[in-house]
Amino acid sequence: MKTLLLSLVVVTIVCLDLGYTRTCHISTSSTPQTCPKGQDICFRKTQCDKFCSIRGAVIEQGCVATCPEFRSNYRSLLCCRTDNCNP
């Protein structure tokens, strides 16, 4: 009986842990990847600098614990909490 109870506890822990993983696009050319523990927000930011008219906007994607603060050189900033929501 103790063995069965222990097995159920282990299965529950494994299932709960799997339920909290997030997958996000990490770079524009990659397939979605699992985010590190504690980073359950996907983000995508597009920013320009003084060379934007020559090389285009810089796109950064990934996983974060908190959404980055919007800055004046960002063209856009997306933060979301569902899998693969930052293509």
From Swiss-Prot:
Disulfide bonds: 24-42, 35-63, 48-52, 67-79, 80-85
Keyword Secreted on entry: yes
UniProt KW keywords: Acetylcholine receptor inhibiting toxin, Disulfide bond, Ion channel impairing toxin, Neurotoxin, Postsynaptic neurotoxin, Secreted, Signal, Toxin
Signal peptide location: 1-21
GO cellular-component term (any): extracellular region
Quaternary structure (record): Homo- and heterodimer; non-covalently linked.
Protein name in UniProt: Kappa-6-bungarotoxin
